[in-house]
Amino acid sequence: MRKAAFHNLGCKVNSYETEAMQQLLEDAGYEIVPFREGADVYIINTCSVTNVADRKSRQMLHRAKKMNPSAAVVAVGCYVQAAGAELKKDEAVDLIVGNNQKKDLVQILDDYFADHENSGEILDIGHSQEYEELHIRRIADHTRAFIKVQDGCNQFCSYCIIPYTRGRVRSRRPEDIEHEVRGIAEVGYKEIVLTGIHLSSYGVDFKDEQKENLLTLIKRLDQIPGIERLRLGSLEPRIVTREFAKELARLRTICPHFHLSLQSGCDATLKRMNRRYNAAEYQACCEILREEFDNPAITTDVIVGFPGETEEEFAETERFLKAIHFYEMHIFKYSRRAGTRAADMPDQVPEGTKSVRSDILLALEKQQSLEYRGRFLGTEEEILLEEPIEIDGTKYMMGHTRQYVKGAVPYEEGLKNKTVKGIFTKALNEEVLLLEKE
């Protein structure tokens, strides 16, 4: 029996695909072992979203070869699409597997072990491709399952390489998604998170008569017994209409936790980024969600130091973030990415300036996050318990509310994957609130 070890880099879509590839190899008779252990095959699911991600991908490939020089080292995913020619010349890499070829991993390995040749022909991901069918029966996290529902992106934001590494939008058939989620529910998962490269585009590639979109998919999954919570991955603001929000608010399982990608609060910067909305339109989306849901958690991403971002443009973004008041913000310093339009733009911002701006927004994020959590003190809430933690020497069982606020109860055996209700009485630290059970 051959041993295989996996290492995942990057987003939740990659995590889903890594789980699916592990299960493919298990079904083919491989033993899956931890990455640090000796293996016959090392599979690194790479990321290429930034130059740093490229470097980490190369480092992990070389680390695997050093761990066992006789093992087959397999590079999979986005970095393969971005730098396949370079990887073919890398002596640490034995096999390359592009996006939309992961379902064929077992056959690719069989062929390799038969003749020890790297046949890695990378598909042109930019050409029209069908959705690559990968499936899972379980997830390493035993309370929350990430479900991939689409791949690819048609947006071509000026800073982003992903449309070139993932290709155009390809949506998964809704009946296939439903079948997988029913299976996940049957083995005990209570929460699912719908994820994709551009989740809001789900269904745009279907023929008109199919009339499937993200909202119809959510309604379908809302009916599945055993699923108590349905959480959405990152959304484009333009999907949030009054009708969309009203329909979601009627559903049994939907979590009032919305990650709306912003990137900048300045219209001039948004235009250079090729984001297809302005700050006022984004704010209107947030207002709709707050009118249709009780105290929803709204989170976002912000890029500082985008080419041409002046002090006034940054100040405009800062004012906008203060006005919206997010639960959490992921702050990124712009990373120049070869192959994107932004990499060749004039007025690149110095790294020192990016760091100063990042620090300012991180401080704002911390303040706003504390204020949002504080609203829950004294309120009755429900948390889905996930894992044991220790705070100041005391052991607790920690989970999340539907808004993704962390809560904890005193530790007891057998609480994992249980839902408990109670009152949040105090903060145990900056991130976790204490729930006194009913």
Each model region followed by its residue ranges:
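Terminal RNA-binding accessory module
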Residues: D344-E438
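Short, solvent-exposed loop/turn segments at secondary-structure boundaries
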Residues: A53-R55, R168-R173, G203-E209, R272-R275, ...
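Conserved strand-turn element in the central/C-terminal portion of the radical SAM core barrel
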Residues: F156, C160-G167, R229-R238, S264-R275, ...
